[in-house]
Amino acid sequence: MQYRDLRDFISGLEKRGELKRVTAAVSPVLEMTEICDRTLRKQGPALLFENPTGFDMPVLGNLFGTPGRVALGMGAEDVSELREIGKLLAFLKEPEPPKGLKDAWSKLPIYKKVISMAPKVLKDAPCQEVIVEGDDVDLTKIPVQHCWPGDAAPLITWGLTITKGPNKERQNLGIYRQQVIGRNKVIMRWLSHRGGALDFREWCEKYPDRPYPVAVALGADPATILGAVTPVPDTLSEYAFAGLLRGSRTELVKAIGSELQVPAYAEIVLEGHIHPGEMADEGPYGDHTGYYNEVDRFPVFTVERITHRKNPIYHSTYTGRPPDEPAILGVALNEVFVPILQKQFPEIVDFYLPPEGCSYRMAVVTMKKQYPGHAKRVMLGVWSFLRQFMYTKFVIVTDDDINARDWNDVIWAITTRMDPKRDTVMIDNTPIDYLDFASPISGLGSKMGLDATHKWPGETNREWGRAIVQDPAVKRRVDELWLQLGID
């Protein structure tokens, strides 16, 4: 199913019974968070708050609150179909030379499809139907959520930040939270390894005294939003990838105050600049860890212009102790990650980011072990292959007879196949999410790998245990008797 814009997606979800219109007055201060949190935990619908207290702009929440809705947003009917998207990304990330003329012809349609999905730039766009500039800019007119009692201020959460480095052809899309600190100022919290921060750093090195142009799209179409959180190869723009997901070219328009291109059908666009050296204390905020994070300094984004559609919809979320929307996104994107990892490590059978692990802090890998030390190679590969996993603290590796998504299986493997000293890998002084207050130094901490695989000769001198398995003939006989036994 193709969704041209957020409104098209809302309509499609409503027809499926996946969206609920909330007509009662609900405050964006704390109340929306509580309602969305309860709804998400019951795997409930997306919520369109039509009467936010004190505002005349509707708020869309819990949009990606189930893996199924994430799949729909990526153009799939089921989460299992996301594996095919992962296979495409794996191919584009590391394309193999054709093995012959026939193989070359078979791959040609893929390349043609990618080339055909170059974004389309419009002269006029719905996102610029209304233009607010200068002293009329007032972010307090947008119903930005204040999510938790201890939060420092209202927080923009689903802002799609568009940047471009001075030495790069392509633009970068990233989702970074933004603390509102005035009618026209927000704090741009981007971590140092993220694309927006890297672009800004390059700009400051080349133009240390010039303001850096930035645009933030609020309420883009689902494919563009999700394209920004997917491990897209550096050779492919997020806009082109969104076109592949959607099945049609992403439509853009030039920002009014810069050369940046923004989604033509976004509900709201913030345009402005970051002045090198202008920083502010950000936080504290309740985060996806379930705790309030420390205060840290980040650049200030000055909003010089707000453009929006007529009767815009504000798209928002909250983060908190899992499950929350980032955790649900992690569950769905699991299916995208698996083929990408398998491309580099064919021995991997499954890969799982348990939502209880705060989206990415713990990973479970099942594999077909082939030699002593193989599990350690795989765990090191997980940490280093995709930048999405550089902050993963714990990697558990098991054999392929274990279900990575069943803690009963995983814990059994850990307790029966591991010696704590021999089978634990500790790595010190590695990059850690600065939100992780458990690390001894902000941004720097350790990682642990757990080898819960069967041990091969060379890894142990002992006779290894054989798993207990019932006689298949006995199981078949009991299957035949089961109804007669009257047990259930």
UniProtKB/Swiss-Prot annotation:
Residues where Mn(2+) binds: 172, 238
Keyword Disulfide bond belongs to the record: no
GO biological process: ubiquinone biosynthetic process
Co-factor binding comment: Binds 1 prenylated FMN per subunit.
UniProt entry tagged with the keyword Lyase: yes
First-listed, main subcellular location of the protein, grouped into a coarse class: membrane
Enzyme category, top tier: lyase
Locations listed in the record: Cell membrane
Active-site residue list: 287
EC number(s) per entry: 4.1.1.98
Pfam families, A to Z: UbiD (PF01977), UbiD_C (PF20696), UbiD_N (PF20695)
Reported cofactor(s): prenylated FMN; Mn(2+)
Residues the entry annotates as binding prenylated FMN: 175-177, 189-191, 194-195
InterPro entries: UbiD (IPR002830), UbiD-like_C (IPR049381), UbiD-like_N (IPR049383), UbiD_bacteria (IPR023677), UbiD_Rift_dom (IPR048304)
Keywords: Cell membrane, Decarboxylase, Flavoprotein, FMN, Lyase, Manganese, Membrane, Metal-binding, Ubiquinone biosynthesis
Assembly with partners or alone: Homohexamer.
NCBIfam families with a match to the protein in the record: PRK10922.1, UbiD family decarboxylase
Function of the molecule: Catalyzes the decarboxylation of 3-octaprenyl-4-hydroxy benzoate to 2-octaprenylphenol, an intermediate step in ubiquinone biosynthesis.
Protein family (similarity comment): Belongs to the UbiD family.
Protein known as: 3-octaprenyl-4-hydroxybenzoate carboxy-lyase
Gene for this chain: ubiD
